[in-house]
Amino acid sequence: RHARDGSVCPGTVKVRSEERVLLDLDALDIDHVMPQAWTAHWPLSDGTSVTAEEAAAAAIKRFAPEGLDARSDAILLRQEAIPRMGNLTLVHYGVNRSLQNSAFAAKRKALFDHSNLHLNRQLMQLDTWDEQGIAARGEALADLALKIWPGPV
């Protein structure tokens, strides 16, 4: 079981109240909800845009003796959040390829249209996706994993 209520079992999706069908796991792909190439469609939480060049410069500033300014720090926090578990989900391969670096609104709509995985339900209810959302979802996924696989007792 990977849902607390038992509505979704590994390898199956509940289509109707009594009917289960096999889920084609080979058709799923791992998606970075906030994409690795985020600068084009994902402004910082203060609403300002970032260029790819500015993101690269922030990574270099990390090692400068004068340290980071607030903007560079925000850029680096975003860069560090992107590969985290809370930012990853499963989507149909074709959906992932068509959306790649799209804004959250487009990705959320695609989840509504093409996903019935319990894993994506919380994402479909959100209006925004940022570093705080990534951290919160990561903690929730870790808590769920510990309930499913509690380890040795």
Predicted regions and their residues:
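Aromatic-lined ligand-binding clefts that engage carbohydrates, nucleic acids, or primary amines
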Residues: 1-56, 74
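Short beta-strand-alpha-helix junction that forms the catalytic/metal-binding core
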Residues: 28, 41-96
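Long, cytosolic, alpha-helical-rich C-terminal regions that act as interaction/scaffolding modules
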Residues: 73-153
